[in-house]
Amino acid sequence: SSCNSKKYLEDDQSFLMSNKIKIKSSYPIHNKSEIKESFLNYYRQPQTKYALFFPRHVFYYQYQEKLKAKPDHKKWDEERIIKNRPVIYDSLKAEQTSDDFEKYLQLRGYRSATVNYEAKTEKKVTKVLYQVNPGPRIFLDTILIIAEDSMLQEIVDKTKDNILIPPESA
C-alpha cells in the first residue's frame, strides 16, 4: 500500500517512533518536569512527527513516488521536504543523547548522574527509553578561599562581597 513506508527501508534500518524518558532516583528530585523539558533540546534524533494520525514520512515517500512518476511535477519547497523527511534510528545518536543528558545533569549539580538507553525494535519501528538516575544533587553551602600570601588574602577579603554567585542559586 502507499502508506507502507517501511518498504523503503534497508534491512538494518527502522523508523524512530518514540523517545521516552524515565527519571528515577533514591534521592529527592525537586525539578523532575523541568529536567524532562530541558532534555527536549538535547535529543540528537527527534522522534517521528505525526500529521493527521499518519507519520509525516508517509507523505515524504508519497511525494518521492509522485516525482518519479512525473519528473516535471511542481516540486515542494525544500523546507516542506525536510519537515517530512523520515527519522531513521541511529544507535550512535542515541548514545550521544545519553552522554548529553549526563553532561547536562552534571553541570547542574548532579555529579554522579547516569543515563542509559534501551532501544526496542519491532517490525521496523524503534522506541527508545532513556533511563535517567540523577543521583544526589550537590549544593555549595560555603566557599572558603585561603591564600598563603598575606597580601593576596587581604585582596580576597576585600573582594568577598563582590561574588558572582548569588546566595539563592546555591
Task: Identify the residue ranges that each predicted region occupies.
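Interaction-mediating elements
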Residues: 4-170
